[in-house]
Amino acid sequence: MLFIQIRLDEIIFRALEQQKGLTMSLTLYQSSVQSFIQTISAILTCLDKGRKFCRDNNIDRNEFIDARLHPSMLPLHFQIVTLVHFSEGAIDAAEKGVVGGPDMTLEFDYDGLQTYLASSLERLGALNESEVNALISGEVIFKYEGVILPFTTEDFFVTYALPNFYFHATVAYSILRSSGVPVGIANYIGKVKTTASPNIASQFHQYT
């Protein structure tokens, strides 16, 4: 029995060691900045489609600025501004160690909103990967309207910034879709990063 137990312990130990070797290593840059870039690029494409839709249907595109998914929800303008807040702003918060709410004083027309989002995308693309990864294991303190909430950098991104980012991206997409703009899931997903050949990768969206 002792021999069997030793053998079982050895098998379990080896299995655990193999599992460690298979553990995927995902950096802060990969899980945040690369995701921000992919989704913001996709939303910019949706906004471009919104512009074309308005032109083709003689609609003032600035009417979309105040469009809402539901009367109780905030408009497209807020969704885009907040998208920047929880992406580029999240990186800035990790650097400074503090985060608040989005800037509610910003005002843009449709063109200005596109430019604002495109400029943020450009700045995200210019970030240094090593410098972003070096922000790990820090602290970010949320301070807003009397609420103070401390996070580790990891928890700030995983449980707060990223969920909020995807929520506002989804609402922005849904506002455009519900307003008649011909966008679908492939437009929302955007350009995926794959090891497939360019020819195969180009066919991906027909399955989404």
Predicted features and spans:
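C-terminal or internal capping secondary-structure element at the end of a domain, subdomain, or sheet
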Residues: E154, A161-F204
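Acidic interhelical loop/turn segments
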Residues: C54-I65, A126-F157, I189
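Conserved alpha-helical segments that form or flank metal/cofactor-binding pockets of metalloenzymes
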Residues: S72-G100, S120-L127
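Structural signal for well-ordered, non-membrane alpha-helices
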Residues: I40, L44-R51, E88-I91, A118-G125, ...
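Short, Lys/Arg-enriched N-terminal segments with co-localized hydrophobic residues
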Residues: Q5-T23
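Alpha-helical scaffold segments that form or flank carboxylate-/histidine-based iron centers
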Residues: S25-Q38, D60-H85, D103-L113, I148-N164, ...
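Mid-length scaffold segments of soluble, non-membrane domains
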Residues: G112, Y116-S119, N128
